């Protein structure tokens, strides 16, 4: 993750990002510190969102990271804050596949996705779903049976 995030941020200079399925907001915090840009951190679990908000405060990026509880993209904040230059999602392959078309509606043309939480044997299915949603494959970063994907709209 850090290597992929560093290279995408350096190459693309995103201005507005989303961490979907943020959990404890580790990626949102890392991105806010790295790029000094606004990051929306969203999770389906309200307890995770509370923990994330605490972590954001502890890391001194509460001026940059906003935490919300939402199922997928079902929250008005996405219309207010999006579309995004960069979306990070570290969630399971099944939900990633289901969200492919919504990802396309919420990322700017030319914007990037960094997707992880994908077992290497699930990579082809995830790529198929995102290609069908008009994303272009950039690269895969494999690690111990898991993959992180970089895709662009």
Regions found by a protein language model. Name each.
Residues 1-72:
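Conserved SAM/SAH cofactor-binding pocket of Class I
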Residues 44-153:
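S-adenosylmethionine
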């Amino acid at each position: 993750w850090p290597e992929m995030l560093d290279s995408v941020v350096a190459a693309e200079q995103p201005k507005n990002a989303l961490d979907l399925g943020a959990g404890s907001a580790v990626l949102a915090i890392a991105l806010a510190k790295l790029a000094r840009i606004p990051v929306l951190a969203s999770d389906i679990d309200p307890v995770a969102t509370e923990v994330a908000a605490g972590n954001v405060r502890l890391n001194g990026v509460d001026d940059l990271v906003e935490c919300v509880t939402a199922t997928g993209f079902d929250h008005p904040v996405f219309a207010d804050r999006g579309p995004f230059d960069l979306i990070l999602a570290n969630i399971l392959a099944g939900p990633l596949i289901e969200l492919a078309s919504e990802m396309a509606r919420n990322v700017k043309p030319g914007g990037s996705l960094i997707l992880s939480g994908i077992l290497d044997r699930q990579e082809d299915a995830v790529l198929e779903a995102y290609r069908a949603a008009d994303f272009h494959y950039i690269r895969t970063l494999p690690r111990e049976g898991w993959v992180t994907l970089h895709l662009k709209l």
